[in-house]
Amino acid sequence: MRSPSLAVAATTVLGLFSSSALAYYGNTTTVALTTTEFVTTCPYPTTFTVSTCTNDVCQPTVVTVTEETTITIPGTVVCPVVSTPSGSASASASAGASSEEEGSVVTTQVTVTDFTTYCPYPTTLTITKCENNECHPTTIPVETATTVTVTGEVICPTTTSTSPKESSSEAASSEVITTQVTVTDYTTYCPLPTTIVVSTCDEEKCHPTTIEVSTPTTVVVPGTVVCPTTSVATPSQSEVATKPTTINSVVTTGVTTTDYTTYCPSPTTIVVSTCDEEKCHPTTIEVSTPTTVVVPGTVVHPSTSATIITTTAEQPPASPEVSTIESVVTTPATLTGYTTYCPEPTTIVLTTCSDDQCKPHTVSATGGETVSIPATIVVPSSHTTQVEITVSSASVPASEKPTTPVTVAAVSSSPAVSTETPSLVTPAISIAGAAAVNVVPTTAFGLFAIILASIF
């Protein structure tokens, strides 16, 4: 007769073997989760079993549903949570490859405080609220379009979409990357009615906030805000086409200044970043009439530069290419005794300086009035630069000499032209409006020598 200990040992070995086999092949695993006041919606007739607990003793309870309804079971309930773990290494690799090719949607749980959401039409919300380390679902019926706010800790799902794996032919296409940036006092302008959802944070806890915008307006969210920022990734260098190309690019960089001053000739909206104690946040300024805008303190404002890069292949174009760059550059100018004529009522904001200290000064002018300020004034000086570029090349095979790009940057009143001189052929560059240059008399001298030789 077999001993009981051997039977127990055999059962244990079989149990361990079966559990390891299940884990290896990635079967579905069901885990028990204890909740309070279990709530679920049954869309059709069904029968399910849950475990209810009283005084640390749990027993199964069968619930029969004959029609579509919402079931609420009070007390402590143990309900199943189903998860599918990954299988073996080869199965994981194949699944990962297929998900990269086709893309997938991953849903995770995020705990937030004071959950807020907007329901545009009648519906029923089911969320999970937590208190004293115990979580239970809460059902909220919504009859009309409204904004629902649930106070306290709430567990809400967050969905993330993974993009499909790009093939080699699609690797050169641009990719849009969205990242999260934490700012203080978030400001944005909404030209059309819309709904904004941002995450506001307090004491290291963040929760979403929905803002309804019905008319064109500027929205300011005080405090710490997590907002998305979008950037475009350029294609890889290896996938660039080899045919002749001309690239026109505009590069915008941030320049840090103190007491930023600019003149707006027409109604517009200016967005700059003001900084205080190593923290920067965007500031939106609405300009309704032609005026001078002064932003005191440390300001990061955009600075734009334009570049043209022309590459030549084995067969250059028959006719030269003519390109024109035009840019408006605004620089501060210091004047003593500022005078200007205001044909219409307006408000002028100037920066006056005294004893090496400058501060904004506001002057209100009526229509048809000449305003004079006998002091040292810092005013913006705007000028337009226009550079016309002609690029032509001789017929030189690309295999003998790689093409050297010609870069022209129009960022100041004196156009700066920088060229790299190749050893074989130098592209001919002419700039309209530039000073006259001396022509190298090599060709004329050779012609003169030939004439003298023919005479003597």
Swiss-Prot record:
Per the UniProt entry, the signal peptide is: 1-23
Disrupted-gene phenotype:
leads to increased sensitivity to Congo red, Calcofluor white, and zymolyase, delayed filamentation, a higher surface hydrophobicity, increased adherence and flocculation; as well as to a diminished ability of protoplasts to recover their cell wall.
Coiled-coil portions: none
Ordered alphabetically, the record's keywords are: Cell wall, Cell wall biogenesis/degradation, Glycoprotein, GPI-anchor, Lipoprotein, Membrane, Secreted, Signal, Virulence
Q: Write out the PTM section of this UniProt entry.
A: The GPI-anchor is attached to the protein in the endoplasmic reticulum and serves to target the protein to the cell surface. There, the glucosamine-inositol phospholipid moiety is cleaved off and the GPI-modified mannoprotein is covalently attached via its lipidless GPI glycan remnant to the 1,6-beta-glucan of the outer cell wall layer.
Propeptide residue span(s)? 434-456
Q: What is its main location?
A: secreted
A GO biological process this protein is involved in?
A: fungal-type cell wall organization
Q: What induces it?
A: Induced by caspofungin, tunicamycin, during chlamydospore formation and during cell wall regeneration following protoplasting. Repressed by NRG1 and TUP1. Also regulated by TSA1.
- In this record, residues modified by a lipid of the kind GPI-anchor amidated glycine are G433
How does the record classify its membrane topology?
Lipid-anchor; GPI-anchor
Glycan attachment points: N27
Q: Name one GO cellular component term.
A: side of membrane
Which compartment or compartments is the protein found in?
A: Secreted, Cell wall; Membrane
Function in brief: Cell wall protein which contributes to cell wall synthesis and is important for acquiring normal surface properties. Required for virulence in a mouse infection model.
The name of this protein is GPI-anchored protein 13
